[in-house]
């Protein structure tokens, strides 16, 4: 499996993602935002960070980078694209995913471990019959997912919600919502389910000595179901 991680000015999770992908068998290449062509890829990842310093809006300037045209063509051809945190923000700013990501409910930067419940387990990102609650890490100031009434109806009708913020038992409620996100949404797909955006960082949970192992389960499922 070949993957590409896009580096923007201000990305700070690109190397973490590179380590995670290689650990689980991907042949990964780092791609600079000013490049115009993607290398051979089965998966393209837009990593976390603060692209362009989060000026204007988070992800807005990065969504206009030269590489985004190739990513758009790749996605329209059915290629798998994943955006984590700032990468999720870039995907909504580019129109590849619905909705927007607003300031957190209490206007504070949040950095902590949380639990998420996987939805739509028939897709290649969360296809695991033994597990549907994951412990991941979040670190963001703008993770409050929001969209119009028409959009949220369409998202629910098409089963596009990938992850809900939950407690450790998988209960989705106000108490388990860290940022005010609509319907506790932590991640969404496009209609075709080949593009995923999520605020939590699975790449930070791949070493039990440092954090946890739920990210390992995520990446193992990912590569197994891309084969």
Listing of model-derived features with the role each one plays in the protein:
Residues 87-88, 122:
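Short, flexible active-site-adjacent loop segments at beta-strand->alpha-helix junctions, enriched
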Residues 72-76, 101-227:
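Amide-donor transfer/coupling interface in amidating biosynthetic enzymes
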Residues 84-86, 140:
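A secondary-structure boundary/capping signal
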Residues 1-84, 91-98, 104-110, 117, ...:
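N-terminal beta1-alpha1 cap of cysteine-dependent amidohydrolase-like domains
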